[in-house]
Regions:
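Rossmann-fold NAD(P)-binding glycine/threonine-rich loop
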Residues: 96-148, 153-166
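NAD(P)+-binding Rossmann beta1-loop-alpha1 motif at the extreme N-terminus of oxidoreductases
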Residues: 1-50, 54, 70
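A non-catalytic, amphipathic alpha-helix used as a structural packing/dimerization or gating element
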Residues: 35-46, 64, 94, 160-171, ...
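Hydrophobic/aromatic beta-strand patches that form the interior of the parallel beta-sheet core
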Residues: 28, 70, 85, 135-137, ...
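Amphipathic alpha-helical segments at domain termini/boundaries
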Residues: 18-22, 63-83, 164-174, 178-182
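Rossmann-like NAD(P)-binding element
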Residues: 35-39, 50-112, 118-120
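Internal alpha-helical scaffold of NAD(P)-dependent oxidoreductase catalytic cores
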Residues: 25, 130, 151-182, 193-198
C-alpha cells in the first residue's frame, strides 16, 4: 500500500491525512472546493510546525510529510489510491453516493473505508461491487493525538481487508480494535454512553 486518498478536508479528514503522510504514505486530500483543500493543507502545516516547535518532529520530517500530500477537487483523480478513507458529513445518502462513485473510479484492489461513527457499513457497501473491500474506519478527534481506531466489519467485509487496514493503522501509530459485527455507536460510543448512564 502506497497511496491513501482522504475524502473531506474538514477537521477529521485533515487529521487523517496528516497522520498518513507522517507515516510515510502518499496522500491525496480531496474536497469539493479548492479553498477547502488549501485550508486543510494549511492546517496540516500548522499542526506539523507545532510538533517541530515541541521537538516531537524534525523540520526534515515535516517537509517530507508535506511533500507527500497532494490536494485536489477532482474525484476521478482521487480514485488512484490503494485505500480511500471517506470523512464527509454523517449522512447515509451522501456516503452511499460517494461509495458508489469511488467503486466505479478505483482499481479493483482498492479498499474503501468510512470514518463514520454510527452508520451501517453493510448499508453503505450495498450499492457497490466490492462489499468485501469496504469497512468502517472510525478515527477519534483530534486524530494526531488519539491512538484508537475502530475497524468495523460489514456483513461481507473480508478478513484480508481487515488485516491490510490493521497494518496501515500500525504504521501510522494507531491501535486498532476490530468489531466483527456492527452495533449502534460501535464500541467506544457504547462504552462511554454506558458509563454516562451509570
Amino acid at each position: 500500500m502506497r497511496t491513501i486518498t482522504v475524502l473531506g478536508a474538514g477537521i477529521m479528514g485533515v487529521g487523517i491525512a496528516q497522520v498518513a503522510a507522517a507515516g510515510g504514505y502518499n496522500v491525496i486530500l480531496r474536497d469539493l472546493q479548492k479553498r477547502l483543500v488549501d485550508n486543510g493543507i494549511s492546517t496540516i502545516e500548522k499542526n506539523l510546525q507545532a510538533m517541530v516547535d515541541c521537538a516531537q518532529f524534525s523540520r526534515e520530517q515535516m517537509e517530507e510529510a508535506l511533500a507527500r500530500i497532494e490536494g485536489t477537487t477532482d474525484l476521478e483523480y482521487s480514485g488512484q489510491a490503494d485505500l480511500v478513507i471517506e470523512a464527509v458529513v454523517e449522512n447515509m445518502a451522501v456516503k452511499k453516493q460517494i461509495f458508489t462513485q469511488m467503486d466505479s473510479l478505483c482499481p479493483p484492489h482498492t479498499i474503501l473505508a468510512s470514518n463514520t461513527s454510527t452508520l451501517s457499513i453493510t448499508e453503505i457497501a450495498a450499492n457497490t461491487h466490492r462489499p468485501d473491500k469496504i469497512l468502517g474506519m472510525h478515527f477519534f478527534y483530534p486524530v494526531p493525538k488519539r491512538p484508537l481506531v475502530e475497524l468495523v466489519k460489514g456483513l461481507e467485509t473480508a478478513d484480508e481487508t481487515i488485516d491490510i487496514t490493521r497494518e496501515f493503522c500500525a504504521r501510522i501509530g494507531k491501535i486498532s480494535v476490530v468489531l466483527n459485527r456492527e452495533s449502534p455507536g460501535y464500541l467506544y460510543n457504547r462504552m462511554v454512553l454506558s458509563l454516562i448512564n451509570e
